Design a protein with these regions (language model features):
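Amphipathic alpha-helical packing segments from all-alpha helical-bundle domains
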Residues: 137-151
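Second-shell loop/turn segments in exported
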Residues: 28-35, 56-62, 67-73, 127-138, ...
Length: 202
């Protein structure tokens, strides 16, 4: 009985091993680009909020704009969802052979730099009062950042082979990069707040 069960299961094990062997891991270049960008944005965010007073953290250029503390809170609310979405997409069958990404890698990079066009945040990610304490929100952000970097350093997933998004797909490598460029975009927003002429001196 045990032998028959083993015989029935064996083909599935062989298939799973074959699929795993056929999956190509990230290139060294793709892995390095992701790692460096995530390390960069983690360092940049820490530097931008270091030593800010409560008045500086809560300052708003206008009532309808976010404060610095709210920008960081948004990152801690949104990016765990982005990470979960990525993990789900990577577990799906590879499908990029039949699709074409709607964006280039340069487009994804530019998203983190260009704030000429402002988009409205939704999907629950606008709940920027979830975290009131900067120390708490930074700890949450940094813990996820460390998890993502560990994944980048060790994964054998072929992120380029998996699509992300139904209506306007990009590949999963691009989506990982966009998580970090999303952070960069809000770092730019924090710099805009600090550059406001009415930003508290201390």
């Amino acid at each position: 009985m045990h032998i028959m069960r083993t015989i029935r299961v064996l083909p599935f094990l062989v298939l799973a091993m074959t699929l795993r062997l056929c999956a190509a891991p990230m290139t060294d270049e793709d892995r390095e680009h992701l790692r460096v960008h995530f390390e960069m944005t983690g360092h940049m965010l820490a530097e931008e909020v270091r030593g800010l007073s409560p008045a500086q953290l809560e300052y708003k250029a206008s009532p309808d704009r976010w404060s610095i503390r709210e920008c960081v809170s948004h990152l801690a609310v949104a990016e765990p969802d982005y990470w979960r979405d990525l993990q789900k997409a990577v577990k799906a069958p590879p499908d990029m052979k039949d699709k074409k990404s709607v964006a280039t890698d340069a487009d994804i990079m530019w998203y983190g730099i260009d704030r000429v066009v402002h988009t409205k945040t939704g999907g629950g990610h606008e709940k920027v009062d979830t975290y009131k304490n900067l120390g708490e929100v930074r700890a949450k952000f940094e813990a996820l950042h460390a998890t993502v970097i560990a994944y980048i350093n060790t994964t054998n997933d072929d992120l380029r082979a998996h699509s992300f998004g139904d209506q306007a797909p990009i590949d999963c490598w691009q989506w990982m990069l966009e998580i970090s460029t999303h952070t960069e975009r809000h770092i730019q927003q924090i710099r805009e707040i600090k550059a406001d002429p009415n930003f508290p001196k201390k």
